[in-house]
Amino acid sequence: EIAQCLVGSEMCIRDRICTWKLNDHDGYGQATSKDLINWTSQKYPRTTPDFDGVRVKAIVAGEEQKGNINRVVWTLVDGLDKNYGWNQYRNSLHGERPIQDGERFAGLKPVKATVTVQPEGAKAISDVLLGAFFEDINYSADGGLYAELIQNRDFEYAPSDREGDKNWNSTHSWALKGEKTTFTIDTTDPIHINNPHYAVLNVEQPGAALENTGFDGIALNTGEKYDFSIFARVPQGKSNKLQVRLVDGKGNVCGETSLTVSSRQWKTYKAVITAKATADTHLEIIPQSVGELNLDMISLFPQNTFKGRKNGLRKDLAQVLADIHPRFIRFPGGCVAHGDGLKNIYQWKNTVGPLEARKAQRNLWGYHQSMGLGYFEYFQFCEDIGAEPLPVLAAGVPCQNSACHGDLRGGQQGGIPMSEMGAYIQDILDLIEWANGDAKKTKWGKVRAEAGHPKPFNLKYIGIGNEDLITDIFEERFTMIFNAIKEKYPEMIVVGTVGPFNEGTDYVEGWKLADKLGIPMVDEHYYQTPGWFLNNQDFYDKYDRSKKTKVYLGEYATHIPGRKANIETALTEALYLAALERNGDVVHMTSYAPLLAKEGHTQWNPDLIYFNNREVKPTTGYYVQKLYGQNAGNEYLPSKITLDNRDDQVRKRIAASIVRDSASGDVIVKLVNLLPVEVNTNVDLSGIGAIQSSAKRTVLTGKPADTPLPVEDTMEVAEKFDYQLPAYSFTVIRIKKANEK
């Protein structure tokens, strides 16, 4: 619907009210503006009859539109016209790309540059600047980082996971092969109320097999061991032996075992299967006797997980993440955390405890969350790789884009009812107790200890909200949560939110709330073009250093047509990260998004790392993140760049960042060149202290559309040294102080 603008009669004083429909029959939203450019936060005050009676039709630019026609003062029209002109100019800058460099830099010769360090201006910067953001999108968890090989192991898939898809049900990924046996789903007497569905096999004559296809198959590696487990019972009390096989597409048995189900009650049965071949297989469970069998939580897990953890993570994927050296991990997601509607808000308590007692739910990205990868596993992974955990919880409201658009209160659906907010806030406080509480003295500390981790996880950060519409509904609930955390856990660093963009109403109102409450940190998000990042390297230079609130750039990425990841996008991000290091006194954390994507199951591009069942495929941008993560510092050494070319188009495409790691004493020089020609650079490190003459150099370079790997070698350095910065390149030079090994 075209929004109608109801303009007050006192044009220079009154706000203009923009009103729009939430559905076809009643309910509406409103926002106000003095100039039709800057708007207040949205409100959903009451229901109203249909707008058709107050609208008129008009032909605008050759097309019929519906709305109101109002007489306004010229200053308002003039302001709109000037704003349009400014946006057109800004969009032209944001549209700059290397594809235009042939024309833009026709005849450009190699540039000479001097990079001079200014150690007297050194400043401390965040020691947790570069991290990772894990969201369960693109099959990142089940079928991805979570090492479980059986899909729909709990028979809890439901059509509601995928917008009513009838084929997405409790039998998805399962099939019965053979005759004289039936396969049905029951809920009469489950293992746990949170896991109500289970399989029932009625065997009239042995020979049939219950099969599971896994996630695009089950990939085995020769000689590796796999833990098979199953909850089962024989209601009639007659024992039944199960043959368990892993079979490839040609019918070859690549691994097998057997076990006997003998209990009338639910019981766990376990066995180990050793792979006879490297193959893509499926699971077969073949009962050897007649009678009824009940089966649930059918699991196949590689023993060779990351750090050898039970119920752990896929080793190669987890290692690629660990190699970034992320100083923190944000989880379990952004949109996943605040959910698609009130009923879909992520509840952390449903993800801890025994696997059979965890409560699965719909993933708003169109599939299922088993919760096998739950809060315990997230915290454990953070600990395993030395990263700070940063859990994100809903701020009492779901995503404003929730599918229930017909709700009269908008996508936020009025938020969690006030009668329930006390319990919801207690859940958040319980999370902090679960993470940090004494294993013997606190209720939730004991729960953590019972899961195998008696020592506290030492949680320091907690995110409240994600990209939320900053409405009165949000503000009221966020404030309640924030004040409760501040009162009970004053040392906790709460990370708030300022909407989904780096400008606009939610950004402005979100920052107002941060200033009002004194929120320690806010989470900014923006996915932008190469030209935006190129022309906004000073975005945080202008930040008010007197503010108490720090910035977490929680989601960002460079987007180009086709959403590809290549040298163009990677170098753009390298250039911007140099600016973020420069502003590391106010930008406390950063994380690229999204992190993982399974080939054939993506809902978003680009992603940092793609994978399938056998391969991990880091993008070019991954290596930029890795180079910054492995070469981080906690002291920023300002530098001055002097060029022999005064063209601003040249200047803004060359960047340098010099940091020192106090733990090692190493000085790290990062140089970025987004020009199509070499930059002959003299690096002057006078004043930083004695250094070794040999340094490690890593270079990532190629044509804009290329996807190369970085090349590492050594180079000679001195207090002053020359270096030819290749066209379209990112170079990291790590220099040790003298007398260090």
Task: List PLM regions with ranges.
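The substrate-binding groove and active-site-proximal loops of carbohydrate-active enzymes
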Residues: 301-309, 357-372, 409-422, 460-475, ...
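Catalytic-core region of carbohydrate-active enzymes that cleave or remodel glycosidic bonds
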Residues: 483-486, 490-493, 511-514, 520-631, ...
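Solvent-exposed strand-to-loop "edge" motifs in beta-rich extracellular domains
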Residues: 231-236, 274-276, 630, 672-674, ...
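C-terminal beta-strand-rich structural cap/linker in extracellular carbohydrate-active enzymes
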Residues: 713-741
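Extracellular and organelle-lumenal recognition/adhesion modules and their flexible linkers in secreted
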Residues: 95-370, 388-390, 405-419, 489, ...
